[in-house]
Amino acid sequence: MSAFTPASEVLLRHSDDFEQSRILFAGDLQDDLPALFECAASRAHTQQFHHWQVLSRQMGDNVRFSLVAQASDVADCDTLIYYWPKNKPEAQFQLMNILSLMPSGSDVFVVGENRSGVRSAEQMLADYAPLNKVDSARRCGLYHGRLEKQPQFSLESWWAEYNIDGLTIKTLPGVFSRDGLDVGSQLLLSTLTPHTKGKVLDVGCGAGVLSAALASHSPKARLTLCDVSAPAVEASRATLAANGLEGEVFASNVFSEVKGRFDMIISNPPFHDGMQTSLDAAQTLIRGAVRHLNSGGELRIVANAFLPYPKILDETFGFHEVIAQTGRFKVYRTVMTRQAKK
């Protein structure tokens, strides 16, 4: 996070209107505006660990990372500024959660890029905080309303699940491939052989499908799963529990909270952060893997075929091989040897 996003720039056009406001920022917080905005008080809630990392340096305890907001997160706030994400169910989950805690009469602002579908906020909040569009600039929309009725929110009602090969996969809004196994992960799964042993790290674990499938035919594998997303962390824990599997699951910005070395690292790394294309996570994954692989350990990732990962793999490990591919995806494998750049 550094330069302001277009959505934040639209908000700054109205900064004078917020000088007396006690604001809760939430949603897709892609910059540090919540820490810098001139207002009476500022808090933030995020489901993204890497956003919390940045904001907590400036906001301290006034920003919290968790799956759901609690009453303490909205304490004394009279205004919500919500950054619309690209995922509509994720927006609905977060807004219903937060608005169930905000006092009636609170100002509600929703801002986001037009291509993200932000205009659907009007219909989503019609029964709770009817919205009017108050600005349109930088290909973004800014909407305002007042909270007339608090929605009811129960976390349990948001859980969903699907089944693959006898495994139950638990999911939540905002988790990658919430409605079923994606094609890339399916291709990566096809390359995993039974009776894998040793310590396995699943980076960007999503709903835990890769680890659950691996553990189902490799019971001696010791699993560690991590993701930047709070919904993904909770979904992975639930997936392991639903299938009687064990593993350590925690939030981490790629390797930021990972300790130790592993015999295998598997991943279907993201190449978007919110609406923006970003290869940062995948590059950090590949370059950082050398510090978390045992000698002879392997990195195995799946990616869209057009992404420039072969170059980064070769620069870091000295070589790579493609062990499976379709027209759209490739599974890359490389091994920790002496020639890897530590």
From Swiss-Prot:
It catalyses: guanosine(1207) in 16S rRNA + S-adenosyl-L-methionine = N(2)-methylguanosine(1207) in 16S rRNA + S-adenosyl-L-homocysteine + H(+). Keywords: Cytoplasm, Methyltransferase, rRNA processing, S-adenosyl-L-methionine, Transferase. Disulfide bonds: none annotated. Pfam families: MTS, MTS_N. The keyword S-adenosyl-L-methionine applies. The keyword Methyltransferase applies. It is an enzyme of class 2 (transferase). One of its GO terms (molecular function) is nucleic acid binding. Transmembrane segments: none annotated. It comes from the Bacteria. Its main location: cytoplasm. One of its GO terms (cellular component) is cytoplasm. It is found in: Cytoplasm. Its EC number is 2.1.1.172. InterPro entries: DNA_methylase_N6_adenine_CS, Mtase_sm_N, rRNA_ssu_MeTfrase_C, RsmC/RlmG, SAM-dependent_MTases_sf, Small_mtfrase_dom. Specifically methylates the guanine in position 1207 of 16S rRNA in the 30S particle. Belongs to the methyltransferase superfamily. RsmC family. Monomer. This is Ribosomal RNA small subunit methyltransferase C.
